[in-house]
């Protein structure tokens, strides 16, 4: 029977690593039996074992990434694989702060020649 992911998430890292080792050994023995000419039920068990290994690795990687995110939460620089995935154009675009900056000449021009407002008499 296949493992349930929600049950795997409750387990500790050591327990998951131990389970992963057992499944890998089981997969190796199933592959040997396949070469030796095992029955059909053994061959179908290879698929479920591979999927179970993938589930365990997914849960382990998920928890590792979550721990890394917590570690880098308030840091200035975050590793590339933990950063938010954006398009290349968005990553290279100016930040709101950079967009709002003005040159000294522009500041003086706005100060000394403000936009004139006109009221129309109806």
UniProtKB/Swiss-Prot annotation:
Species annotation: Schizosaccharomyces pombe (strain 972 / ATCC 24843)
Protein's recorded name: Large ribosomal subunit protein uL29
Alphabetical list of InterPro entries matching this protein: Ribosomal_uL29 (IPR001854), Ribosomal_uL29_CS (IPR018254), Ribosomal_uL29_euk (IPR045059), Ribosomal_uL29_sf (IPR036049)
An individual GO BP term: maturation of LSU-rRNA from tricistronic rRNA transcript (SSU-rRNA, 5.8S rRNA, LSU-rRNA)
Assembly: Component of the large ribosomal subunit (LSU). Mature yeast ribosomes consist of a small (40S) and a large (60S) subunit. The 40S small subunit contains 1 molecule of ribosomal RNA (18S rRNA) and at least 33 different proteins. The large 60S subunit contains 3 rRNA molecules (25S, 5.8S and 5S rRNA) and at least 46 different proteins. uL29 is associated with the polypeptide exit tunnel.
Protein family per UniProt: Belongs to the universal ribosomal protein uL29 family.
Location within or outside the cell: Cytoplasm; Nucleus, Nucleolus
GO molecular function terms attached to this record: mRNA binding; structural constituent of ribosome
Major localization listed first in the record, in broad terms: cytoplasm
Pfam families documented for this protein: Ribosomal_L29
């Amino acid at each position: 029977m296949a493992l349930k992911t929600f049950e795997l998430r409750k387990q500790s890292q050591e327990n998951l690593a131990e389970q992963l080792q057992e499944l890998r050994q089981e997969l190796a023995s199933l592959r040997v039996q396949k070469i030796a000419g095992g029955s059909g039920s053994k061959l179908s068990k290879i698929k479920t074992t591979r999927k179970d290994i993938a589930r365990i690795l997914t849960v382990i990687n998920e928890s590792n990434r979550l721990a890394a995110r917590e570690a880098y939460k308030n840091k200035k620089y975050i590793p590339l694989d933990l950063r938010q995935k954006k398009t290349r154009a968005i990553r290279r675009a100016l930040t709101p702060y950079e967009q709002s900056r003005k040159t000294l000449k522009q500041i003086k021009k706005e100060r000394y020649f403000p936009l004139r407002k006109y009221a129309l008499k109806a």
